């Protein structure tokens, strides 16, 4: 399991990056969600890694 936290604002970001954050369940700064470490999830995390903090859960 991966704990993913949004640490930077989505304001002014590319629309596809905002959509990726929303697909991960991240809408507000400080929100943390847990996801399985599937290739699809890891790809989404990699795409917006500059907005996130990722930890192993």
Curated annotation (Swiss-Prot):
Keywords: Ribonucleoprotein, Ribosomal protein
Pfam families the record matches: Ribosomal_L30
GO molecular function: structural constituent of ribosome
GO terms for cellular component: cytosolic large ribosomal subunit
InterPro entries: Ribo_uL30_ferredoxin-like_sf, Ribosomal_uL30_bac-type, Ribosomal_uL30_ferredoxin-like
Stretches that traverse the bilayer: none
Alphabetical GO biological process terms: translation
Family: Belongs to the universal ribosomal protein uL30 family.
Oligomer and partners: Part of the 50S ribosomal subunit.
The protein's name: Large ribosomal subunit protein uL30
Organism: Clostridium perfringens (strain 13 / Type A)
């Amino acid at each position: 399991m991966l704990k993913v936290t949004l640490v930077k604002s989505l304001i002014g970001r590319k629309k596809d990056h905002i959509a990726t954050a929303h697909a991960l369940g991240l809408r507000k700064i400080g929100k943390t969600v847990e996801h399985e470490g599937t290739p699809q999830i890891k790809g989404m995390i990699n795409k917006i890694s500059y907005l996130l903090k990722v930890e192993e859960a």
